[in-house]
């Protein structure tokens, strides 16, 4: 089989942790189900990269960790102790943040909000990101029904453009179109308790030129609002960047080449039901969906990307100069890029089975819900750790599917076959790397009353020894 591995980029601290199987054995004792292991020191390291960049560029620290990325209480404590803020997307996330110690000064409430969510946010004076005009009207109604403090709001725009290049956000169900700004301004005039301080745009784009063009449009809107006697001074550029997840991006490019070649020649793609991750040949013999699948992984450094945005030339000067001259602050909401490389998931082999056409599969103690496969398709090869060394099969190579323990025919985390140097045996460990961002607990559930996940913290003590304990 012509197999192309997709190797994960692994942080040195995690490499050290998994090199000692005693650490894995200790973690495995905590639960019979999936085990998510997170590393708060790596999370703190990622935070400091952004803080250092902000300090270097004379920017105030408007860095809001996106809570939805990971439910870990430990991550919230690290964020709080390192003086960054938090963005919450639900009432329960707000309660979690408040109970951790965050206050109105460092909480932003975003995404569509229920009446209960709005009520609690207003009681605690949290910054509220306005998702639509009806939400703004709900805030006005709630304010009139009780004793509330001034409400600081952020207006989220979804259709920014640029005067010197074509820039447009994709159609989305979230946020507000620019043509509705006059109606919003009228509501602000009529309700003086609404304090318009922030402008936000949500543009999921990985070309810094386009992001910079949108940022310039946002700056223009802020400057125009001053003519209407408003005084917003902070622009939230969201974030939406993942950073490098692969040891070598060429692994991914070669794998896409493999899928395209096998599909074009009608060969076996070595994927479940020969699906090839949507890559297919059209009636005109054109390879379709390749470009879409390719975008899953990028060779991208988030700090470098942010630096490129600020140094981008527009209107004959760069974005950073415009922000400083206008006395505007820059807010970002990193989630994925803060939790990247901060953890992995440990699974146990519970069996294996033979399939048709000499195919085989290894079965692990988890299911598709445990790694949020509806949110993310997992492509990266896992790491196989033998529980007991077995030298009898080292001369074999195994290309197996990984099955889960749910009673569904689509309960397969990875559609592609996985290469194993040694045959996986019962009690062996299968490690999925970099699962701390939107993967480990984003949509986890205990289907058919299976053992649900447990989250563990791995942190070095003063003796440079890893200590493992529940989150």
PLM segments and residue spans:
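Active-site glycine- and acidic-residue-rich loops that bind
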Residues: 129-138, 170-179, 205-216, 245-247, ...
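Conserved radical SAM core fold
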Residues: 72, 93-95, 115-117, 159-172, ...
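Glycine-rich tight-turn/loop motif centered on a GG-T
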Residues: 32, 104-105, 123-127, 166-176, ...
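Rossmann-like NAD(P)H-binding beta-loop-alpha module
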Residues: 143-144, 150, 164-181
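Non-cysteine beta-strand/loop elements that form the S-adenosyl-L-methionine
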Residues: 89-92, 110-113, 150-164, 197-201, ...
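C-terminal active-site-proximal or functional interface alpha/beta core segments in diverse enzymes
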Residues: 213-215, 223-471
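Conserved, mostly hydrophobic/aromatic
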Residues: 43, 68, 90, 121, ...
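A charged N-terminal "starter" segment
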Residues: 1-143, 147-151, 186, 191, ...
């Amino acid at each position: 089989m012509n197999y192309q591995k997709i190797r994960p980029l692994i942080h040195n601290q995690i490499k050290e942790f998994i090199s000692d199987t005693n650490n894995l054995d200790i973690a495995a004792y905590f639960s019979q189900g999936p085990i998510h292991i997170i590393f708060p020191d790596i999370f703190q390291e990622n935070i400091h990269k952004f803080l250092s960049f902000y300090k270097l560029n004379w920017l105030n620290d408007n860095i809001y960790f996106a809570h939805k990325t990971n439910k870990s209480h430990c991550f919230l404590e690290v964020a709080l102790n390192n003086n960054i803020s938090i963005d919450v997307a639900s009432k329960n996330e707000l309660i979690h943040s408040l109970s951790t110690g965050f206050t109105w000064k460092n909480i932003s409430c975003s995404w569509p909000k229920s009446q209960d969510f709005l009520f609690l946010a207003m009681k605690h004076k949290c910054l509220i990101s306005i998702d639509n005009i009806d939400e703004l009207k709900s805030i006005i109604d709630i304010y009139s029904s009780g004793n509330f403090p001034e409400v600081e709001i952020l207006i989220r725009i979804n259709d920014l453009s640029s005067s010197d290049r074509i820039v447009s956000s994709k159609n989305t169900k979230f946020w507000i179109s620019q043509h509705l700004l006059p109606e919003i301004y009228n509501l602000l005039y009529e309700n003086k308790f609404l304090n318009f301080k922030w402008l936000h745009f949500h543009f999921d784009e990985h070309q810094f030129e386009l992001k910079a063009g949108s940022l310039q449009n946002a700056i223009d809107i802020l400057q125009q609002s001053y003519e209407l006697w408003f005084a917003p001074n902070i622009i939230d550029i969201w974030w939406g960047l993942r950073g490098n997840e692969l040891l070598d991006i060429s692994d991914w490019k070669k794998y896409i080449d493999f899928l395209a070649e096998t599909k074009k020649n009608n060969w076996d793609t070595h994927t479940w039901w020969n699906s090839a991750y949507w890559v297919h040949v059209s009636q005109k013999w054109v390879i379709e969906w390749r470009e879409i699948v390719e975008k899953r992984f990028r060779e991208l450094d988030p700090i470098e990307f942010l630096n490129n945005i600020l140094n981008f030339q527009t209107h004959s000067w760069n974005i950073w100069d415009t922000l400083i001259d206008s006395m505007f602050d820059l807010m970002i909401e990193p989630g994925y890029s803060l939790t990247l490389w901060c953890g992995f998931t440990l699974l146990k082999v519970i069996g294996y089975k033979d399939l048709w056409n000499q195919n085989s599969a290894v079965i692990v103690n988890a299911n598709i819900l445990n790694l949020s496969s509806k949110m993310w398709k997992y492509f990266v090869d896992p790491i196989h750790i033998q529980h007991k060394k077995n030298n009898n099969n080292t001369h074999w190579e195994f290309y197996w599917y990984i099955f889960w323990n749910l009673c569904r025919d689509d309960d397969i985390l990875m559609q592609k076959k996985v290469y194993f140097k040694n045959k996986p045996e019962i009690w062996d460990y299968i490690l999925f790397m970099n699962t701390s961002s939107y993967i480990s607990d984003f949509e986890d559930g205990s289907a058919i009353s299976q053992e649900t996940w447990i989250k563990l913290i791995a942190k070095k003590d003063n003796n440079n020894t890893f200590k493992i304990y529940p989150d």
